[in-house]
From Swiss-Prot:
Keywords: Glycosidase, Hydrolase. PANTHER family: INOSINE-URIDINE PREFERRING NUCLEOSIDE HYDROLASE, NON-SPECIFIC RIBONUCLEOSIDE HYDROLASE RIHC. It comes from Salmonella agona (strain SL483). Pfam families: IU_nuc_hydro. Belongs to the IUNH family. RihC subfamily. GO terms for molecular function: purine nucleosidase activity. GO terms for cellular component: cytosol. It is an enzyme of class 3 (hydrolase). This is Non-specific ribonucleoside hydrolase RihC. GO terms for biological process: purine nucleobase metabolic process; purine nucleoside catabolic process; pyrimidine nucleobase metabolic process. Its EC number is 3.2.-.-.
Length: 306
């Protein structure tokens, strides 16, 4: 199959990010043209190191640019308690000499977008700081973005605060700017990603699959979003799955606003499912997932990796 969808991936690896990067690299329908890193799960220095380690592991020739070290207006609150101090605890990657591009992520994204023959798809599976910086500094780039597919937000409960999902809560000002920008957005939030559970039986078969399966199995052993006994949630992988298998998701067009001021609600995505606010929809929000179909696709795409 010839790859038909050219994508840019903005990420903060992160254990489930590693699985998403594998899918972005090896799903035959996708052509990954740039990876950018952002502070989120751990510091941007660590997310950059982790992404470079993964590219070296797979001998993948994809450029990488380091992005924002802090949210727009707030100090970074990371998720090392979920992913480990390094962000990818559990596997000993070999040393390498790879380096990021000598320009910040938002400029690297701009350069790829402006030189592309047609609008491209952005995929963001970390805080939206880099995407907001792109749209703030180069608003003309919006015309070159086919759509933004993001992992973040929730129409209900949060996983970082009672109401807020981690990626949005880390930099709510950036998320608010992106949702107000007018670009087409597909939001894969906790409503679907909490359903995207890889079962213990699925996980037990990974080491026999290939060296990627062995590596991911080692990482998942240290991933605190679930356990090897009960299953692990593949939050970030949902954004990649939607690109390739959108029929697995039930979407609804909604108006989404991001709360930036509330003492208890900052970072909350206000998803107006019933249209009570009278605002035009600015996102397609994923609300349900075909879990069996998702697991089947994950098995297929992991099998495509070395």
């Amino acid at each position: 199959m010839t790859a038909s969808l050219h994508i840019i991936l903005d990420t903060d690896p992160g254990i489930d990010d590693a699985a998403a990067i594998a899918a972005a690299l090896f799903a035959p329908e996708l052509d990954l043209q740039l990876i950018t890193t952002v502070a989120g799960n751990v510091s941007v220095e660590k997310t950059t190191r982790n992404a470079l380690q993964l590219l070296h592991f797979w001998d993948a020739d994809v450029p990488l640019a380091q992005g924002a070290a802090t949210p727009l207006l707030r100090p970074l609150r990371d998720a090392a308690y979920v992913h480990g101090e390094s962000g990818m605890e559990g596997y000993d990657f070999v040393d390498h000499q790879r380096q990021p591009l000598a320009k910040p992520a938002f400029i690297a994204i701009r350069d790829v977008l402006m030189n592309a023959p047609e609008p491209m798809t952005l995929v963001a599976i970390g805080p939206l700081t880099n995407i907001a910086l792109l749209l703030m500094h180069y608003p003309e780039c919006a015309c070159n973005i086919r759509r933004l597919v993001l992992m973040g937000g929730s129409a209900g409960r949060g996983n970082f605060t009672p109401n807020a999902e981690f990626n949005i809560a880390v930099d709510p000002e950036a998320a608010a700017h992106v949702f107000r920008s007018g670009i087409e957005i597909v939001m894969c939030g906790l409503d679907v990603t909490n359903q995207a559970m890889l079962s213990p039986d699925f996980l037990s078969k990974l080491p026999a699959l290939n060296r990627t399966g062995k590596m991911l199995h080692s990482l998942f052993n240290h991933y605190r979003s679930g356990s090897m006994r009960t299953g692990v949630r593949m939050h970030d992988l949902c954004a990649i799955a939607w690109l390739v298998r959108p029929e697995l998701f039930t979407l609804q067009s909604c108006f989404v606003a991001v709360e930036t001021q509330g003492q208890y609600t900052a970072g909350t995505t206000v998803v107006d499912i019933e249209g009570r606010l009278g605002q035009p929809a600015n996102a397609q929000v994923a609300l349900a997932l075909d879990v069996d179909g998702f697991r089947q696709w994950v098995a297929e795409v992991f099998a495509c990796a070395p």
